[in-house]
Amino acid sequence: MRKNFALIGPRGVGKSKISRKLSKITGMPVVSTDMIAVYEMGGISIPEFIQENEGDWKTFRDLEFQILVKLKTSRGIILDCGGGILFDLDTKGKEVPSSRKIDLLKSIAVVFGLSKPTEILVEKIQNDPTRPPLSAINSYRSIVENRLPHYRSVSDYYLEIDDLKVEEVCSRILHKIEY
């Protein structure tokens, strides 16, 4: 049975687009943690769910963990992870690396971290109404800057994809897993 692989990285880096292209190349199904979350939440969007929870991401972060638990026995999938998959909230509501989620993710899949320069990501996300709102306290820029070292440290392979075409990113990923 083929091994799973997971794509992690900040919002807007291209994880979903790259995972869909990888699926076309390999025939492996894509499993999106965000899409499973929407299903588990009864079909409401992530922004609506966060709004219903008065801006509190804790319940959503717990749901992400439960999704990873359900995927533990999956084989031969491409896991398209939401941008916050590596994180939980501490008792004060501050985002912190989640050892429970990180350990589980690494037991499920070979992890590929994807990154682009922060300015490119900020520009892409700023006015995208399909993206969940980020905390009023933290700007997207500071969230990305705080998360990047964790994406890098958790990744089995870390790719700076800057201006690479989707096909080139897929080629690099497939080369690493010797597909």
From Swiss-Prot:
SUPFAM superfamilies: P-loop containing nucleoside triphosphate hydrolases
Protein name, per record: Shikimate kinase
Pfam families tied to this protein: SKI
Family label: Belongs to the shikimate kinase family.
Superkingdom: Bacteria
Associated pathway: Metabolic intermediate biosynthesis; chorismate biosynthesis; chorismate from D-erythrose 4-phosphate and phosphoenolpyruvate: step 5/7
MF GO annotations: ATP binding; magnesium ion binding; shikimate kinase activity
